[in-house]
Amino acid sequence: MADKPHMNLAVIGHVDHGKSTFVGRLMFETGAVPAHLIEKYKAEAKEKGKESFAFAWVMDTLKEERERGVTIDISHKRFDTDKYYFTVVDCPGHRDFVKNMITGASQADAAVLVVAAPDGVMAQTKEHVFLSRTLGINQLIVAINKMDAAKYSEDRYNEVKKEVSQLLGMVGFKADDVPFIPTSAFEGDNITKSSANTPWYTGPALLECLNNLTVPSKPDTLPLRIPVQDAYTISGIGTVPVGRVETGIMKKGQKVTFMPSGATGEVKSIEMHHEEWDQAVPGDNIGWNVRGIGKNDVRRGDVCGPADKPPSVADEFTGQIVVLQHPSAITVGYTPVFHCHTAQTACTLMAINKKLDPKSGQVKEENPTYIKAGDAAIVTIKPTRPMCIEPVSEIPQLGRFAIRDMGMTIAAGMCMSVTQKK
């Protein structure tokens, strides 16, 4: 299984543009979902009058999602091509799920943007493309989907392609380097092989485009960083934090420190998939036990690193943000919640240093009095309690964040520099 390189693939795009069906079809065509299961889902979906959702039900396994026909939590599914094995992060499309999208996309190495041919670019198409870019996804494939509903029209395909290309250019993707494919996830067009329904399209099918992706280099040369997702107390063992290794390598016997608490100890054991390992590398989801660490020393949002190169704890930091939505204007003193790796911390906006043109990154205004939806800016931020964050130039995996308030994602951004807590 581990012989093929592994890639995390995000599937993004506006709600109801067919993302879940698309992923279901992909899983089915690569043999990851047995045909009899699809038949069973088809029968169930037909009973509920949602026949076209059969493939989507592979992904939407949560009952509530089935009833609403909406993908809520991020479902992880695996499929193989002859070159890679992929874990699909099916990113939810509805408005209130952007936070999931941010935590989902930040785990992705590449993304497929699904745009429905009849609708073209919609509000969330823009938002997702924008977020993916901010979150550091730089490999993209565009599937212009539901071609069956657009009667396989080449003209319509070209119109949407032009629209999407303009959007990609705005956020800094080179549209010429991005493959565009006309697909119908429901009918299976251009997923595994070229379709007779689109004789005017001579490019590769989706699977070939997936094989053409390049594996990002593993950040195992960077210092060890593991954001803690949870900490458990297990009788006979002690405190076991769990989390995903973002950078570096953890070895048994290593001295590690948890920040911001500062608790330090020696790694006694590392466990993954119920097996003991001598070391853990980036991408591994592990539980590990540290000698001398008690239940109260570690909590969600802490970051584990080497004792001699501990994670940075910010007194203040400078960030580049993009405001996605806000009912009015954002001014100095605003204190929303920042979601960074596994931490959720209220932070105060101390200064708006520069307003940028979101398309080009050029400075539009120095020290503006406010910023609003659609603006990009360089800002100074002060966490209300100690928080680990690293500059994206040093450890990108711990440098990206989302800003939430009033039940919505206000902005996304990245940390440019950190003033360390003394």
Curated annotation (Swiss-Prot):
G4: annotated segments: 145-148
Residues the entry annotates as binding Mg(2+): S20
Keyword Nuclease: no
Major enzyme class: hydrolase
Chain spans, region G2: 69-73
Family: Belongs to the TRAFAC class translation factor GTPase superfamily. Classic translation factor GTPase family. EF-Tu/EF-1A subfamily.
EC number from the UniProt entry: 3.6.5.3
Residues that coordinate or bind GTP: 13-20, 90-94, 145-148
tr-type G domain boundaries: 4-218
Subcellular localization, as worded in the UniProt entry: Cytoplasm
Main location group: cytoplasm
InterPro entries, alphabetized: EFTu-like_2 (IPR004161), G_TR_CS (IPR031157), GTP-eEF1A_C (IPR054696), P-loop_NTPase (IPR027417), Small_GTP-bd (IPR005225), T_Tr_GTP-bd_dom (IPR000795), TRAFAC_GTPase_members (IPR050100), Transl_B-barrel_sf (IPR009000)
Function according to Swiss-Prot or TrEMBL: GTP hydrolase that promotes the GTP-dependent binding of aminoacyl-tRNA to the A-site of ribosomes during protein biosynthesis.
Molecular-function GO terms, alphabetical: GTP binding; GTPase activity; translation elongation factor activity
Stretch list, region G5: 184-186
GO terms under cellular component: cytoplasm
Key words, A-Z: Cytoplasm, Elongation factor, GTP-binding, Hydrolase, Magnesium, Metal-binding, Nucleotide-binding, Protein biosynthesis
Keyword Nucleotidyltransferase tagged: no
Protein name as annotated: Elongation factor 1-alpha
Region (G1): 13-20
Pfam families: GTP-eEF1A_C (PF22594), GTP_EFTU (PF00009), GTP_EFTU_D2 (PF03144)
Gene3D superfamilies: P-loop containing nucleotide triphosphate hydrolases, Translation factors
UniProt region (G3), positions on chain: 90-93
Catalytic activity field: GTP + H2O = GDP + phosphate + H(+)
